[in-house]
Amino acid sequence: DKVGAQTIAQADDLKIIVRAGAGYDNIDLEAATKAGVVVMNTPGQNANAVAELAIGLMIYMARNQFNPSTGVEIAGKTLGIQGFGNVGSLVAAKALALGMKVRAFDPVKSDEDMLVRGVEPTSSVKTLYADCDYISLNLPLVTVTERSVGYDLLSAMPKGGVLINTARKEIVDES
């Protein structure tokens, strides 16, 4: 649910808004600031649930939406992780346990942080998309990530490649 300016204005004694999970995109930060309301979030609080969802969606797609006569295993497939933070690192651990090869791109995380977890770092996001059967999108919604995944990256994926977006919908440019 969104916490907009009208809701904030009507809550005379409101002092703090705490959002479960990462991000603030469902809260009108300008209205909260004007009203003197502190806004907080709980990054990482639901990271495991989101990572499990990403893995579940990969299995669902690999099994052709659980059509009993078709589908493939994910073991041996390559997973690319865009964004190696709380969720991305958990997705990597779960994918490795299922026998997947895992690569990642994150301009903030060090290669060593990925390597120590058994993940191969990639030098560019385009390389990640071109080399992976599945991409797990785990980015915050900020100015630089909004609409950052579009035709150029998606068309670089191998035939049959699957994008799993458990981040914010606004990161994918659907135009």
Stretches found by the model and what they are:
Residues D1-F66, G71:
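Phosphate/diphosphate ligand-binding glycine-rich loop within oxidoreductases
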Residues V3-A5, K109-S175:
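Rossmann-like adenosine-cofactor binding region
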Residues A5, N26, F84, S89-L90, ...:
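Residues forming the Rossmann-fold NAD(P)(H) cofactor-binding site
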Residues L14, A75-L79, Y151, G160:
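Phosphate-coordination loops involved in phosphoryl transfer and adenosine-cofactor binding
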Residues M61-K94:
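Glycine-rich NAD(P)-binding loop of Rossmann-like domains
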Residues A92, M100-K101:
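Residues at the starts of beta-strands that form the adenosine-phosphate
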Residues D106:
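Conserved acidic E/D residue at the C-terminus of a beta-strand in Rossmann-like folds
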